[in-house]
């Protein structure tokens, strides 16, 4: 899908000033409308645990999912898809090889990629896979919890399974201390202007948690939305990664895609929590909230902290 010249310029951060709230909301909903209109085909290779709800969430948003992980499908699916989402949960050897093939093809075809490094930092095996995948595609968004994202910086940071063991501020400090670069990738040292050098190899980072932090070169936005119920069901983070790929399929701006997906998913969670009686009824209401997402709900609920990175 060619989006050149057809992208809203949301300009989430202008120097140190926040974008006007309604302009931000309108820009996010414009991307929602574009997904519903264009129905981008999102190729998702995800873990066995969340395949069904991930596909349903994409459909609810308005995108079209394909969930193939056959090596024989890789070339064709790469050609026809509009975005790729790689989730490295259940990292069986054959699946990892398919992921590498798909990311290589996406790079060759300049397709947008979202990488979810599930469990990175929890042992050498997963961390090694995550770093190998991270190196493959240049046009990508990384989406994970603070522990997973920080494990990609090369620091000796370990996690407990797939659980997050870092708070947002600690993660920000780790990322800020992971070298800082100018746009040419030249190291500046941590005391000079620049941004975390991990962003030289990724258009944006989504660090998910109680609050979501989105980073791009020169930009940082923190969203204070969501509900604790999202931690009581499996797959909400994996779903966010797939939704991010859908947004990235309809805009060339990775930061816009990351912010829009994070906002929509978190607000859908809030709406679902108000109707659900517990985890068992949360997910159906979450799907309904994605399907019925509108600009009014976004405007009423979006809570943003935004600063220059």
UniProtKB/Swiss-Prot annotation:
EC number: 2.7.1.50
GO MF assignments: ATP binding; hydroxyethylthiazole kinase activity; magnesium ion binding
Domain of life the protein comes from: Bacteria
Keywords for this protein: ATP-binding, Kinase, Magnesium, Metal-binding, Nucleotide-binding, Thiamine biosynthesis, Transferase
Pathway: Cofactor biosynthesis; thiamine diphosphate biosynthesis; 4-methyl-5-(2-phosphoethyl)-thiazole from 5-(2-hydroxyethyl)-4-methylthiazole: step 1/1
Signal peptide: none
HAMAP family: Thz_kinase (MF_00228)
Protein name from the UniProt record: Hydroxyethylthiazole kinase
